[in-house]
């Protein structure tokens, strides 16, 4: 079935759908990873975005239940050069088209993804719309123009939990209530995790560090956190513009004075804002598995997994030590507060997908909590 991808600037890409009749709209970005499409599809940080995979052949190892990063597909639409309909992998339980179709996600193939990527790289990420109704392309352009801009858009409410939950090691479980309050499930150092779109591999790696976790909605107040009695606080990744989450920025500005804190991606940006910094939108973002980052504390070069469209302005921060920098564009990738037990990185140490060069971040946070609390 014929399909069209229309960008807000009027650029058109003609292809065909591999998910049947449908439509989708969102910010169009590109991901340079050669593998990991299943993790990309289920990463909550891609909410509101249509992802173009630059690798030309996608879907060859199918879909399996082990490699998902959340309960649902999160991308608004999926764009590939060629979709494999006959995967070959011993873990595969369904094809990529079957997976997308089962959750009502529109996919388009047969377009020149290299040309699309170059266009986005030159002109920046922009709104786009996929439609199988190709009779009036300018109407589809109009639909793209009518979509909200990612700047100023808060999307955490679309992906966060409704109520606190715990992590069993393999699955989410509703937090138990004992004597009128949420009960901690174990005996390790208590960690409140703010959910703005948490990835499951982050929960796995925090569990591996021995943390006893309660994952809470991002709307949880500082007073509610205090009543839970944690030893530390963690801010998750998530989608959208961090500056739109004004209440959470305020909450974070209070918590940094009371607990050891760590943040990843959106959590990193929120900590930057809470400490008086500014954020800005990148031209086309960092989305891929091979971004070089330098750890300024050790001099070590890491190959990192990244997925963000916003960044903290280096010049806007005070009382912090810059710990990581991107070697492609010299943007900020991590910082630590000079006086408070606060650390944050912009990229994804949990990978999923991607290299494991940066997984030390979780043990670094664990050591920070141990130093501050004795636990």
From Swiss-Prot:
For this protein, the record's SUPFAM superfamilies field holds: Carbamoyl phosphate synthetase, small subunit N-terminal domain (SSF52021), Class I glutamine amidotransferase-like (SSF52317)
The residues that hold L-glutamine are 45, 238, 240, 266, 269, 307, 309-310
Signal sequence range: none
Q: Which residues form the Glutamine amidotransferase type-1 domain?
A: 190-375
- Catalytic residues, per the record, are 265, 348, 350
- Described purpose of this protein according to its UniProt entry: Small subunit of the glutamine-dependent carbamoyl phosphate synthetase (CPSase). CPSase catalyzes the formation of carbamoyl phosphate from the ammonia moiety of glutamine, carbonate, and phosphate donated by ATP, constituting the first step of 2 biosynthetic pathways, one leading to arginine and/or urea and the other to pyrimidine nucleotides. The small subunit (glutamine amidotransferase) binds and cleaves glutamine to supply the large subunit with the substrate ammonia.
Question: Which protein are we looking at?
Answer: Carbamoyl phosphate synthase small chain
Name the source organism. Solidesulfovibrio magneticus (strain ATCC 700980 / DSM 13731 / RS-1)
